[in-house]
Amino acid sequence: MKFALFSVLVVLLIATFVAADECPRICTADYRPVCGTPSGGRRSANRTFGNQCSLNAHNCLNKGDTYDKLHDGECK
């Protein structure tokens, strides 16, 4: 019985770590724009993302092309 409980706990722990490494793939369609500025001093234009989730998803999926939130609202 103790072994079965231990096994279940190990599986749940592994599943938690695997799920934590996944990038958000589906964001809500609510338009709450955020302006992002390129991370790491890259010289490219600021970019408007549809919402914070979209910015986070972009950063997770594009490790070499990340943006920091500059402010709420569209980039000017």
From Swiss-Prot:
Gene3D superfamilies: 3.30.60.30. Residues 1-20 form the signal peptide. It comes from the Eukaryota. It is found in: Secreted. One of its GO terms (cellular component) is extracellular region. InterPro entries: Kazal_dom, Kazal_dom_sf. Its main location: secreted. CDD domains: KAZAL_FS. GO terms for biological process: negative regulation of smooth muscle contraction; vasodilation. Expressed by the salivary gland. It holds the Pfam family Kazal_1. The keyword Endoplasmic reticulum does not apply. Disulfide bonds join C23-C60, C27-C53, C35-C75. GO terms for molecular function: calcium channel inhibitor activity; toxin activity; voltage-gated calcium channel activity. Transmembrane segments: none annotated. Residues 21-76 form the Kazal-like domain. Vasodilator protein that inhibits vasoconstriction of isolated rat femoral artery induced by phenylephrine. Since platelet aggregation and vasoconstriction are key hemostatic responses, particularly in small wounds, this protein likely participates in the antihemostatic responses during blood feeding. Blocks L-type calcium channels (Cav1/CACNA1) in left ventricular myocytes isolated from rat hearts. This is Vasotab.
